[in-house]
Amino acid sequence: MKNFFFHAPHSALSAKKSIRKNTFPSGASFRAVKKALLLLLLFASSLFAQDTAGLSAPGRMRTADEGFASEEFRRGVQAYYRGAFNEAILQFERSLSYKSDDNLILDWLGKAYYRSGLEGEALASWKRAYENGYGGILMQNRIEVVSERRVTGDAYGKDARYTEAGSFPGMNGDVLVFSEPVSSLPLADGTLWVVAYGSNELLKINVNGTVVLRAEGPINGFDRPLDVIALQSGNMLVSESAGDRLSLLNPDGKFIKYIGSKGRGVGQCVGPQYLAEDENGNIYVTDYGNSRVDVFDKDGNALFYFGRAQNGFAGFQGPTGIAAVSGGIYVADNVTGGIYQFDTAGNFIRTLVREKTFRFPESMKAWNGFLVVCDSNKVISVDLETGATYESAKTGNAPSRLTSAVPDANGNVLVTDMKSNEVYVMTKMQELVGGLFVQIERVNADKFPLVVVELSVENRRRESVVGLGEENFYLTEGKRPVLQQKLIGAASNNKIEDITIIIDRSKESAAYGAQIESAVRSLSSAMKGEGTLRIVCAGAVPATEYKGSPRAAEKFGINVLKTPVSAEVPLDLALRLAANDLINAEAKRAVVFLSAGGVTQNAFKKYGLSELTAYFNNNAIAFSPVLLTQGAADPEIAYLEENTKGKSYYVFRQEGLAPVVDDLRNLPVGRYQLSYMSSLNTDMGRAFLPIEAETYLMNRSGRDESGYFAPLE
């Protein structure tokens, strides 16, 4: 409970002076003093009662209104933890009607509004409590973060400046951990593979810098490994610059086979450098010794090479970094200092970045419309459209040779420094200063004193923080450490996804019945019988038409739908209905919207776009439209897709829709479940028990405070 400091009223101070001057005051003076002190005590008790929701009244009997307020508050907390946020809002509003300025009720009312997607109302409630002196820095930070998130912006762009948040050094005291890190491959669970050129190995490292796995390649080991990429097949590919070959590994780093050999013919290479894979699964390798790019198919069969002089292009002199983006192949040359664009057949298209722009470009990765290039001690962002360059990070004046910069699952940029023998974790300055955004989302005390807590951990840009371990969390109850704290699980490790498919029943989309059937069947089959599939029809009155195993929908027919085609479709109600059923679903959950891309009149009459995106984001629900036509979707659908997790797909895209489910499964979800044994007195289940959670990661931390009720006895 927050302590309140106040000045005594002037009359009370005068009364105290009177007591000091007169040992035996007159009867009238004594009554005045007594009255003033009584008013003072009542004022103090009323101040302290503003954070109790009527659950307690220190030094006096509770009033009837306080009793009613506490009962409604209890029901509100229980509804909140059930995921019934609208019900929780009603209960907290009722509680507030009995205690109109209670800060604890205002805090929880704001939480319920926030989870319901009504962020404006949440902020108003929190600000009211904060202005009453409640919450301190913790409440102030929450208000700032939520306010900032309502202003959308690019997570990575030309103005993004990154600074070091921590590092993984190659030496731990006198112990060698790895030598000369040259590239890295971040994974969806927060871990990363690091290629160690000097120690000839591949290391898997968690977010705390602990090596959890080492891979040394085939029996005879790697021969100066230089780059690693993840293939669409799920396997990994490593280039061996001294071995003049590529090594194919399984996801656990086990060797499968070699690709390529030493030489100058097709399928051969001398000093292979960096790797890329295009949308068709073809593999591109910068062949430094042969001054060209070698191309293999997805099975490792040699196709061709390119890089010799052609119209408008003088030929490679020292090809290094390479990236495949939307049908274009981009190659950096460390002799000419430029970046060149080709098509997938090796035909020269243009010089994206003029020569002599870079001093010594190395690895090059695509990220959000930019190429991220390492050049000496700098990380440079290159606009894919214009070729304009922007400095995104710099290591300073110490000896440095940055060789790769790759975005990870937590919104950081992982930078390998071969010369200083470190892997830097770089983040935006405001993230480093602002810390982590931690929320206690659910507390289950049904088996008290065993308590299970569900937490979400995000950065200030609403990006999930994944890969945390038990050592990253510290739980307390009433500021005292809990007993037997354990990390039960992390959502990022969950391989099961619950999916709700919304079928647009507008007249426009109804003309694409065959496409809808194909999409539902493909998505259902891709779920492989795991998780729960729901089908919601967006008609004049949205309705859930199916809930159960995905297997039953693998032979879906459009004729089984009961919801009629409608000229007007309240899409907002369909989206809310779909999301409501996912609140208590698997930790990984998503809505897939099948539509021709248009919206009807009054599609967002009850709920606005910002409220819908907040509802999805604040409950970790991804949104992916599958368009039945090749045209662009209406701006409303595009807004929903751009401001939630997930992305848009075309129903008949070359890769099919099966990878959509994998894409959704691989989205980062920063939710964690911990347990502990409580030592608090429940007062027969009537006491509101406190719980505090702190999360630490490198130089950042975050905190949240909440509470719960044990079962009534």
Regions flagged by a language model, labelled:
Residues D174-A188, I219-Q232, R264-D278, N311-S326, ...:
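Beta-rich, blade/repeat-based domains predominating
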Residues P399-L436:
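Blade-level signature of beta-propeller repeat domains, shared across WD40, Kelch, NHL, RCC1
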Residues E431-G434, N444-V451, E642, F652-E713:
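C-terminal "exit" segments of structured domains
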Residues G434-F437, V443-T500, K507-Y512:
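Acidic, polar low-complexity linker/tail segments
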Residues S492-K547, A553-S595, Q601, ...:
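Von Willebrand factor
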Residues A596-N643:
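VWA/integrin I-like adhesion module and closely mimicked acidic/polar interface patches used
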